[in-house]
């Protein structure tokens, strides 16, 4: 990887290490024993957002607590996936929500897989874990008959935006704000 001043230093091209990482890692549904690791990843996500928008994100917090994670894991409408290595160490998580508007007067009856939260552990970044997770979720969504995959990404996280674009995602809608 070449470091370029003023640009993202994340390389999204596949290399030997990434191919190797894909063979050693497994994506599966999260289990209750994964909760401590998921909470650690949620802290990492929060700090990325806090560093980018401290006016909105408190920092050193998690989006969900352990009790809420148990409910998410048990709910079929909120599939939560983790990527683990050969020692069953959680390297990444992906929270999903199944969305479908039925009989809406304007919106068609499509079934959407919404990615609510995704994080690759800081120590596992650059090893293809994110690509492995994303390929898994694409395959899962196709097999389950979803029309599309959607997510929201904060503008203060340009590396994530570049990653999603590299995965083939395109902007669907844009949220805007005016600070007062």
What does each model-identified segment do?
Residues 150-160, 177-180:
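Conserved beta-strand-loop-alpha-helix junction that forms the acyl-donor binding cleft
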Residues 67-82:
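A short helix-loop-beta-strand connector motif used in the catalytic cores of GNAT acetyltransferases and
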Residues 26-40:
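A short beta-loop-alpha structural element at the N-terminal edge
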Residues 117-120, 126-139, 166:
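Conserved acetyl-CoA-binding loop-helix of GNAT-fold acetyltransferases
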